[in-house]
């Protein structure tokens, strides 16, 4: 088995190859909703070649996307170039997770995949924090069920909004303030401090409120594109896990394969 897992967020799209035993390659590209199957394959073919793989090596594809207008092109990529009918989260893939919220159809594909990936490794109940375009806090019960969560603006979105809405504030890179200083001494350091420590306080405050509301100890896992930025800056996060989403996709693929056999 050679599985191509595609995880598409609003900002980045990840392509990962699993050979049945381990992940052998991972690549990221900027998410562009208008990118065609032909454009994807030109880019992907070069990367596959660097790994010594050809199109014929791929015999399974699973897709998770939060960008509806991109799914057609990703599905077309799978059908035309790999001759594979893909599993698509939210369409033909059976997730095998109990979704205990008022409107289960509104649960984002990425959030459910993360919940499955987390429940495979960590004993629940869990808080799964995904730091991307949005920062989400999702609750996974002790039995693995998805029980809702919180959606907040992402750190990059907040920094972008500062720059675009305030004429004198520059566009800057997001990074941890030098020397862990709280108070900035110029515009750039003040912005970095506000966004970085503001998000640390967001994480610490919401995790504390979630635990208080539920009245039980919970394990907190962080994943996502900028999660590593917070490592060592707070005691509210127990584990940083960059493989959470692709682990969930692999498990969903296996569940569907078993169901079909």
Curated annotation (Swiss-Prot):
CDD domains: ASKHA_NBD_PanK-III (cd24015). Its cofactor is NH4(+); K(+). K(+) binds at residue 130. It comes from the Bacteria. Gene3D superfamilies: 3.30.420.40. The keyword Flavoprotein does not apply. GO terms for biological process: coenzyme A biosynthetic process. Substrate binds at residues 108-111, 187. A monovalent cation. Ammonium or potassium. Its main location: cytoplasm. Keywords: ATP-binding, Coenzyme A biosynthesis, Cytoplasm, Kinase, Metal-binding, Nucleotide-binding, Potassium, Transferase. Its EC number is 2.7.1.33. The active site is at 110 (proton acceptor). Pfam families: Pan_kinase (PF03309). ATP binds at residues 7-14, 133. Pathway: Cofactor biosynthesis; coenzyme A biosynthesis; CoA from (R)-pantothenate: step 1/5. One of its GO terms (cellular component) is cytoplasm. It catalyses: (R)-pantothenate + ATP = (R)-4'-phosphopantothenate + ADP + H(+). It is found in: Cytoplasm. One of its GO terms (molecular function) is pantothenate kinase activity. Coiled coil: none annotated. Belongs to the type III pantothenate kinase family. Catalyzes the phosphorylation of pantothenate (Pan), the first step in CoA biosynthesis. Homodimer. This is Type III pantothenate kinase. It comes from Caulobacter vibrioides (strain ATCC 19089 / CIP 103742 / CB 15) (Caulobacter crescentus).
